[in-house]
């Protein structure tokens, strides 16, 4: 994934420029969080590498005991299955959240702020490319391009 982010760096920045051009607010802090320049893409690459270097979180024993009746109880870490994250317009979260979810064996449903739609879709495209190149299905990482009402409907009935 880090290699793909590097290869697609200019396309990521170009997609982000579309988001920045369409940004209609005067909230400087939000604009700064939305911005994905060369430095921010470098940070995304570094975050992928940092997660890669972490120990595998799956199957670690948390505790283990034998009950007096002989039953053995072992508590091990395991994936949740599928998680969803709803976040503001910060394209780097698309990379960081998906990295952590994938590393921990979870599928992830991403819903970023509407202001970062072009950036997020490009970053999810990068994820799908990385998954495909490694013989995995793209359903590990999915992006919901939903408005507020459709998001709330999904949360009421997540099918």
Where do the protein language model's features map onto the residues?
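Rossmann-like NAD(P) dinucleotide-binding subdomain of oxidoreductase/dehydrogenase enzymes
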Residues: 53, 61-159
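N-terminal Rossmann-like NAD(P)+-binding subdomain of aldehyde/semialdehyde dehydrogenases
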Residues: 1-73
